[in-house]
A protein has these predicted regions:
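Active-site loop segments of alpha/beta catalytic cores
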Residues: 1-183
């Protein structure tokens, strides 16, 4: 209700929080690692397009530009619902998107992810569900082939988001073997 009834209060909070992040980003810019993943865990239901466009896009543009000027490669973690945000993912100057989760776990197809990302790097991309013994192995292998076909060489193939506790580690090994054979 605050966003509708008192947007000036929200704007003040966002500005104050952004300023509070200055010290963190100074440290990130000076650290020796060339890679920074913004681990925000973005979900379109928590950050729908109006919030994304008004508050998050300006913030990320500023911070990603700051990191890039320091020589960093920047990615953001988007593993929740993402379909409503697809048209806006390229509004920020990050290098890639991490943990995009296609169907059947997520709400988008691999092709929709590719269209939205364009030349951005995809990190991960394999639904974690495919590592469960209850899912057909052919679903996993088909997904891996399609990801490599659409995204390679702009792909860091991995599990979106983590292997489940009861996931089959042999499927992880299989993905590694497949990746070597596909590229």
């Amino acid at each position: 209700y605050m966003m509708a009834d008192h947007p000036e209060v929200i704007d003040h909070y966002v500005a104050a929080q952004s300023e509070a992040d200055d010290a963190l980003y100074e440290v990130l810019c000076s650290c020796p690692s060339p890679f920074v993943t913004l681990g925000e865990n973005i979900d379109a239901y928590m950050d729908p397009p109006p919030i994304w466009l008004r508050h998050l896009t300006p913030y990320y543009r500023r911070r990603v530009t700051q990191l890039r000027e320091a020589g960093k490669y920047v990615h953001i973690h988007v593993d929740g619902a993402m379909k409503p945000l697809l048209p806006y993912l390229q509004l920020c100057p990050w290098h890639g998107i991490e943990a995009c989760t296609p169907l059947p776990q997520g709400d988008v197809t691999i092709e929709e992810i590719k269209e939205a990302l364009g030349d951005l790097v995809l990190l991960d991309g394999i639904p974690a569900l495919y590592f469960l013994p209850s899912f057909p192995l052919e679903d996993l292998t088909g997904c891996v082939r399609r990801l490599v076909e659409l995204f390679y060489p702009r792909l860091v193939l991995g599990i979106s988001d983590e292997i489940p506790p009861d996931g089959d580690i042999e499927r992880v090994r299989l993905v590694g073997e497949m990746a070597q054979g596909l590229v």
